[in-house]
Amino acid sequence: MNAHLANEVQTISATARVGPRSLVHVIISSECLAAAGIPLAALMRGRPGLGTAANFQVEIQTRAHATGDCTPWCTAFAAYVPADAVGELLAPVVPAHPGLLPRASSAGGLFVSLPVVCDAQGVYDPYAVAALRLAWGSGASCARVILFSYDELVPPNTRYAADSTRIMRVCRHLCRYVALLGAAAPPAAKEAAAHLSMGLGESASPRPQPLARPHAGAPADPPIVGASDPPISPEEQLTAPGGDTTAAQDVSIAQENEEILALVQRAVQDVTRRHPVRARTGRAACGVASGLRQGALVHQAVSGGAMGAADADAVLAGLEPPGGGRFVAPAPHGPGGEDILNDVLTLTPGTAKPRSLVEWLDRGWEALAGGDRPDWLWSRRSISVVLRHHYGTKQRFVVVSYENSVAWGGRRARPPLLSSALATALTEACAAERVVRPHQLSPAGQAELLLRFPALEVPLRHPRPVLPPFDIAAEVAFTARIHLACLRALGQAIRAALQGGPRISQRLRYDFGPDQRAWLGEVTRRFPILLENLMRAVEGTAPDAFFHTAYALAVLAHLGGRGGRGRRVVPLGDDLPARFADSDGHYVFDYYSTSGDTLRLNNRPIAVAMDGDVSKREQSKCRFMEAVPSTAPRRVCEQYLPGESYAYLCLGFNRRLCGIVVFPGGFAFTINIAAYLSLSDPVARAAVLRFCRKVSSGNGRSR
């Protein structure tokens, strides 16, 4: 919960800068994280509970519908709880008294908060996407992105009504625990338990059950409050009925105050109609408007007379105008008139004595825990947990709302409150015309939607939107589009380089002995097969894994290098060296096996510096750009330069997307990817926004 609290503070401080938006607190289940390819063991290393900083980082990005626009990646607070994630909210553990709230076990999850961008009226686009990037290492292969559309992220209603049973159960468990402590319980906890017991309709003085069976005829002790209550079950809470109605969801503190003020106004009008305001005489003393009951008490204290039945009925009639109390004489008040200043409805400060069961629960909790914490306080108030299912992984996540929260569903949520008006309008329009997609609507239907929601201009009217409109899988389709464009460019570049049967020469210099002539002949004979297997391996790479390769990172660096001077754009992660963009002689390679199945063997690109220009058919020497410490873990292939080992076929690229295919022995040919990579400027910009970040000149690293 602390991650949710921290994200609220961060959002409140940034609201004026980033525009209208809301925040949705979620708990992403361990099953959902695992299905997204995130190793749970990596999230548990260096847990804050063990005294070290968390070994992972979470970043958030908002992606607009159909336009390709994105907000910059920004860091968000997150915490991973390996077990009982929802249970931590519903039944928190007090370190000094771990048995205070028993709870059933449940799955773990990641606590994080996702922003929802909206307009000034709180209307959000259901097809917009919140992207969460979780990195447990510095390389691109040690990060995964989970996408949440606003439609699946924002539930239709909260579920505070389902939480009333839990609050009562927490009170009973506290009474039970205090009774079991007996004389060891703090006096304040005993007092709180006694009041809770009376409020819950149980014995006012709970006592622990005796260890020995009482003899026959002995009076039975009153039962321990909460002794028969089952543990608090997160799964029961998630599946129990109790969804709030839409009207209850929209109720806020401001609306409640408006209703109260309306009732007060009606009462004042009624009193004014019965007793019109009269001009105050010179002898009348200034007074403060008071309720009839308080006025009657003041009159009785001053006059000493007893009230009759008529007076008692008048007490309940309504409020009085200032200076016109029927129980107060028009003459100046004597010494007893100062009692008006002690009117409990106006000037008397509140008492520190708890006035409700919830406040007595607070008193007892603080006495047992030796203090209080914000997360404990929020757990003792109403909590809404809404079970949702993630489209990409088909696993569960939970949307959480707190009574004291300003995020979505919170009782203190600030305007504008999120509204599903756009989603409802799209559904109703499609149903009315019996079409599947909104862009299939008639021109009149589209015009009506555009009049109400101008944000639909690009999805409905743009002839070639960057992303497919009104498609929950639009981001997946866009990633596949970039992947396919890169594969086509690679295939076309290789075919162009090999047209006319060119002679593949030794571009990287290695010396061979006389006894290696037979080996060179065998390798030369296998060149066509090796190249064919290489293309199959590259084409068979899944889109998500493709963006971890040297080829994809070089493409992103090439696209991001168009940003100009001052600030440039680099791929996420630090797979590319900071000096990669400084020279055309800097290459990053992927190594593929030459025996058995052709597979990519390196987890991160291998950076190599060429001493000469390999594109001019001259021999060059190469070296690793960065020395790897001898103690650092690395794969066997990372110990060899391109072409140095017979076991690897190497594919490398520089900042200008000039590529080189290196066979064993240093034999190679060059390719020109940039000449065949066909991406329009809007598509290239959208790719850079999703897979890169801006850095200052001279700093090429980015986690």
UniProtKB/Swiss-Prot annotation:
Subcellular location: Virion; Host nucleus
Pfam family, one: Herpes_UL17
Residue numbers spanned by region Disordered: 200-246
Residue ranges that the Swiss-Prot or TrEMBL entry lists as coiled coil: none
UniProt GO BP: chromosome organization
Gene Ontology CC annotation, any one: viral capsid
Chief localisation class: virion
Keyword Transmembrane helix: no
Ranges that cross the membrane: none
Self-association state and partner proteins as the record states: Interacts (via C-terminus) with capsid vertex component 2/CVC2.
UniProt function note: Capsid vertex-specific component that plays a role during viral DNA encapsidation, assuring correct genome cleavage and presumably stabilizing capsids that contain full-length viral genomes.
Record-stated family: Belongs to the herpesviridae CVC1 protein family.
Name assigned to this protein: Capsid vertex component 1
Organism phylogeny: Viruses, Duplodnaviria, Heunggongvirae, Peploviricota, Herviviricetes
